[in-house]
Amino acid sequence: YFAIQTRKQEISEKEYSSLTEDEKRFYQRNLTKKGNYSLNQAAKNAGVKNFDKFHNAGYKGLYNGETADDIAKRKGLRYREDILDNMGSEELAANLFRITQTESRLKRDKVDTEKKACDTHNKIGKIVRKAIRQAGRNYARRIAYT
């Protein structure tokens, strides 16, 4: 069983590495969309009512204080154009990591208020940002794949 699963993973990694940047971006965007849906469910269970505030808390952590609107302006996007649709695969992967880790923390810590959920999302965003910086990636607000 494990040998088969390992082989499937090797094939998946090989296939992923052969994708173009646009294909990787599309793949990561779909994962991010599913992750956000799941995160929203966990946030709702934690008492979140203002989802814009909740999502901005995560963006502020990851993007050094920037809200979704700030990111959109920096990227030169039109009103209501989705910032996630205008990210490269690496930036989407960073956001997916923020999303999955926040969902996990909300559930594990049994977060039960909107304030705690927003604080948790912001903290996870900062942790992801710090990890990227420590890995040697110059992420400081310049990761703009438009």
Regions found by a protein language model. Give the residues of each.
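Positively charged, phosphate-engaging catalytic surfaces used for nucleic-acid and nucleotide handling
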Residues: 1-146
